[in-house]
Amino acid sequence: KKSGYDSYYKEQGMNAPISKEAEAAYTTALNSLLGKDSSNKYRLHDTSVVFWSQKPTKLEQCFCFIFTSPPKDDPDKNTEVIRDFLKSPFSGVLNDEDKTPFYVLGLSPNAARISVRFWRQGTVGEFASHIRQHFKDLEIIKSKNQRAYFSLFNLLTQVASLNKMENLPPCLASDLSQSIWDNQPYPTTLQMQCLIRIKADRNITSIRAAILKAYLNRKFRNHNNPPKEIQMALDLENKNQAYLCG
C-alpha cells in the first residue's frame, strides 16, 4: 500500500485489474487444465500441478508419469515412459534444442482462495535436459527385480514415515520438484529426511542410497573446486577419506 507499484490511485487487490475478456480466457484455460479428464495435471502432496506447452510435444505427454505414482492397473507404466523419455534424444523424438515454450504452475488451497505455490516457464529443451540430469544423478546399481527408474513419488515415499506422502514436511515435494526443473541442488530437507528414515528403519535401500549420492553430487557440482563425484558403483580409485569410511 502506498508504494511505487500503486498506479492510478488503485491499491492492494485493485492495483492490477484485468478485463472481463482476460478473466474469461484464463479461467476457462485453467478449468480445462484442472478438469477431471485432463492429462495435464497431477497431485503433488498438497499441491495441484498443471503443465502445458505452446504446441503438442513429447514432454507434455510423459511429464505426469515422471513425477507421479504408477497406475494401479499398470505398475510398470512409469518405468516404460521414463525409459522412452531418456532415450528420446537418440531417437529424435525429443531433443534438448527444442525451443517450444513450456510452463508449470503449482496451486495450493489457502483459506477460501487458491494460492500460487510456484510458477516455472522455459523451453521444452531446457526442462527435458534438466530432468534427464536428475535421472542421471540418481543412477545406482540395483538388483534385477527392482525398477530401473525412480519417479518423484518413489523418492518422496522412501523418505516419509510409513512411506506415506502426508508424513512429509510441507514444502519438500514442491521444493524438490523445483530443484529438478531448475537443475539446482536438492533441498537439504531431502537429505535430512533420508538419513532419519535410514536410522529409524535400519535399512539402506537402493533408492535411499541413490538419493544421498545425487544430493551430494548436485550440492558440490557448482563449487569452485568440487570433489570427485560419487559414482553409481564402488569407485576403487577414490581416495577421499570420507568416501573410504563409508
Language-model features, listed with the residues they occupy:
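Extended alpha-helical scaffolding segments
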Residues: 2-246
